[in-house]
């Protein structure tokens, strides 16, 4: 039960701490290389991915 509580608090704190944007920026920076390789066609796809990086990266 203590572990569960800790996990819940960590999840809540992490979401409140705004780690998602930071992760998104890292992914965008990493994707920048792939974006250049992929071309402009991938730009809109990556833009949509920014909103849902987890879903996009699968």
From Swiss-Prot:
Mutation: residue 56 to W/Y; reported impact is:
No change of RNAP inhibition but loss of bacterial growth inhibition
A GO biological process of this protein is: killing of cells of another organism
Where is the protein situated, by its record's location annotation?
A: Secreted
The entry's stated outcome for residue 56 to A/C/D/E/F/G/H/I/K/L/M/N/P/Q/R/S/T/V is:
Loss of RNAP inhibition and loss of bacterial growth inhibition
Q: Which domain of life is it from?
A: Bacteria
Q: Where is this site: Essential for permeation into bacteria?
A: 41, 44, 47, 56-57
Sorted alphabetically, the keyword list is:
Antibiotic, Antimicrobial, Bacteriocin, Isopeptide bond, Plasmid, Secreted
UniProt key word Secreted: yes
Report where the covalent cross-link Isoglutamyl glycine isopeptide (Gly-Glu) sits.
38-45
| Residue ranges listed under propeptide | 1-37
Describe what happens upon changing residue 41 to A/C/D/E/F/G/H/I/K/L/M/N/P/Q/R/T/V/W/Y.
Answer: Loss of RNAP inhibition and loss of bacterial growth inhibition
Where is this protein chiefly located? secreted
Q: Does the keyword Transcription apply?
A: no
Pinpoint the site Essential for permeation into bacteria and for RNAP inhibition: 46
Q: Give a GO cellular-component term.
A: extracellular region
State what changing residue 57 to F does: No change of RNAP inhibition, and loss of bacterial growth inhibition
Induction of expression:
At the onset of stationary growth phase.
- Function description: Peptide antibiotic that functions through inhibition of the bacterial DNA-dependent RNA polymerase (RNAP). Inhibits transcription by binding deep within RNAP secondary channel, where it sterically blocks the folding of the trigger loop, which is essential for efficient catalysis. In addition, it also seems to restrict access of nucleotide substrates to the catalytic center, and shows a partially competitive mode of inhibition with them. Exhibits potent bacteriocidal activity against a range of Enterobacteriaceae, including several pathogenic E.coli, Salmonella and Shigella strains.
Q: What is this protein called?
A: Microcin J25
Q: What is the lineage of its organism?
A: Bacteria, Pseudomonadati, Pseudomonadota, Gammaproteobacteria, Enterobacterales
User: Which gene specifies this protein's sequence?
Assistant: mcjA
């Amino acid at each position: 039960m203590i572990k569960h509580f800790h996990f819940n608090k960590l999840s809540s704190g992490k979401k409140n701490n705004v780690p998602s944007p930071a992760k998104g920026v890292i992914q965008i920076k990493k994707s920048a290389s792939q974006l250049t390789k992929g071309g402009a066609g991938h730009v809109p796809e990556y833009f949509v991915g920014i909103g849902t990086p987890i879903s996009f990266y699968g």
